[in-house]
């Protein structure tokens, strides 16, 4: 983690990304624009990940829409209680209905089977490309959730 030269304390991710962009802008405007976009994307990607404790706290607060990115077939077998299906493979078909039901500012927590499953991240990116900005990925997935004994249905 980058350190503040003056205090020796770690720099927050967004601050570090901003400092990198400012430094690069003094070198070349086009180079800085490229790195700025990459830095912002990286910060968003990193900050969008939730662990089990954070996900459970959000679940308990009833403040989010949980989205299962797996296929509908496995969704109907079991899913986080209250989650809706918005599968990676059928996103384009299912999204119009989702958009009608969920406001653009809704907090959305997307998950799939486990941490190595890329479906949740792909669905999260697709949601963000369609205007949703309050999107998080629960990286532990359904396996971790089930092992913790948290509410499920299906």
Report each predicted region and the residues it spans.
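Flexible, polar/low-complexity N-terminal or interdomain linker segments that lie immediately upstream
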Residues: 2-77
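Conserved beta-strand scaffold positions in the cores of enzyme catalytic domains, especially
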Residues: 49, 66, 83-85, 135-137
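Catalytic cysteine-centered active loop of the rhodanese-like fold, especially the PTP/DSP P-loop
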Residues: 96-145
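Short, structured coil segments at secondary-structure junctions
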Residues: 79-81, 131
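Envelope-exposed proteins and targeting segments
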Residues: 62-63, 71, 82, 104-107
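A mature extracytoplasmic/lumenal domain signature
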Residues: 70-73, 79, 87-90, 112-116, ...
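Active-site neighborhoods of enzymes that stabilize oxyanions during catalysis
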Residues: 150-154
């Amino acid at each position: 983690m980058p350190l503040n030269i003056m205090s020796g304390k770690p720099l927050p991710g967004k601050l570090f990304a901003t400092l990198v962009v400012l430094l690069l802008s003094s070198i070349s405007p086009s180079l800085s624009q490229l790195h700025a976009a990459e830095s912002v994307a990286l910060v968003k990607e990193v900050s969008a990940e939730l662990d089990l404790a954070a996900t459970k706290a959000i679940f308990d607060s009833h403040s989010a829409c949980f989205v299962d990115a797996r296929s509908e077939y496995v969704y109907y077998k079991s899913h986080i209680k209250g989650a809706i299906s918005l599968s990676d493979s059928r996103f384009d078909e299912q999204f119009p209905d989702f958009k009608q039901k969920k406001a653009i500012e809704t907090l959305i927590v997307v998950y799939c089977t486990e941490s190595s499953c890329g479906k949740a991240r792909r669905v999260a990116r697709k949601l963000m490309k369609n205007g949703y900005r309050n999107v998080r990925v629960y990286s532990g997935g359904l396996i971790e959730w089930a092992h913790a004994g948290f509410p499920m249905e299906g």
